[in-house]
Every structure is written in C-alpha cells, then in structure tokens.
Regions:
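Short acidic-hydrophobic catalytic motif
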Residues: 113
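Charged phosphate-binding loop/patch that engages nucleotide di/tri-phosphates or the phosphate backbone
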Residues: 133-139
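Active-site nucleophile-adjacent alpha helix/oxyanion-hole segment immediately C-terminal to the catalytic cysteine
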Residues: 1-74
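Conserved active-site-adjacent core of cysteine acyl-enzyme catalytic domains
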Residues: 49-107, 116-125, 131-132
Length: 139
C-alpha cells in the first residue's frame, strides 16, 4: 500500500544502485514494471535509440521509438480546454485491469509511471499529476 493509505500507489524501485531515489530514471522504472524485465535491460535497450538521436536514454523521443518498435500504442488524452483534467489517481481508479505507461508532467518536466491492474508503481506518489497520455492497455 502507498503512503497515507492510498491503495492505488505502491513504492517501486528496480534500480539497485539508486538507494536514495535520486536518479531521475522514471521512464526506465516504468518500462521495467511494464515489461517485467531488469533495469539494465531497459537501459541497454534505450541506449540503442540514444546513439541514433543523441538524446539521453530516458528522453521521451527514445521512449516513444522504443515503444513503437514493440508495437505498444499511444493514446493522447490531455485536453487543455477540458474543465476536469484526469490525474494519475483518477486514471488508476478508472483502469483497474491492464498495464499502462502513463505520461504526466512534473513542473516543466516529463514523468512516466506504470499502472498495473489499477495500482501505479513509482518511488513517490504522483497521483495528483495530470495525465497527458498513455501507452498500452495490455491485459
């Protein structure tokens, strides 16, 4: 269970070297949970795209190419004119089955988190962040 009794959040840290949760590797964390593989496997997979784009491995461009090559569909869901904007917690409550990689924002930065059967896995509770889109929906 997550902090403050939030049953939709669960702490998740697959990076064995990041003992203080300071690495800024949310995209790699989300992908490890989504695909059920080790942190270094995802990192190595992203480096292949990084060598082409010359962006850091966890850049959103590399993530998109990685997921496109694995045929994981993306759905844009952010509408700046909408009265109610869906948060990660709202999305979790509405999607209690399947796996998703949720794209949200933290300040001016990008944040990715994996939702697995209604629970989002991360090093911190990002439930109040606005969902811009998501990949997946696999069972």
């Amino acid at each position: 269970m997550g902090k403050m009794g939030n049953s939709f959040y669960k702490y998740y840290q697959p990076n064995k070297k990041d003992l203080k949760d300071e690495c800024g590797d949310c995209s790699i964390r989300a992908l490890t949970k989504y695909f059920g593989v080790e942190w270094l496997d995802i990192f190595d997979g992203l480096v292949k795209y990084s060598r082409i784009t010359q962006f850091m491995p966890n850049n959103l461009t590399n993530i998109q190419k990685y997921l496109d090559d694995k045929c994981v569909p993306y759905v844009k869901c952010y509408n700046p004119k909408a009265r109610h904007k869906t948060t990660v917690l709202d999305f979790a409550k509405a999607h209690k089955e399947g796996k998703y990689i949720i794209y949200c924002r933290v300040g001016y930065g990008t944040h990715l988190v994996c939702l697995d059967n209604g629970v989002y896995y991360d090093t911190w509770d990002c439930g109040d962040r606005i969902v811009y889109g998501y990949w997946g929906g696999i069972g």
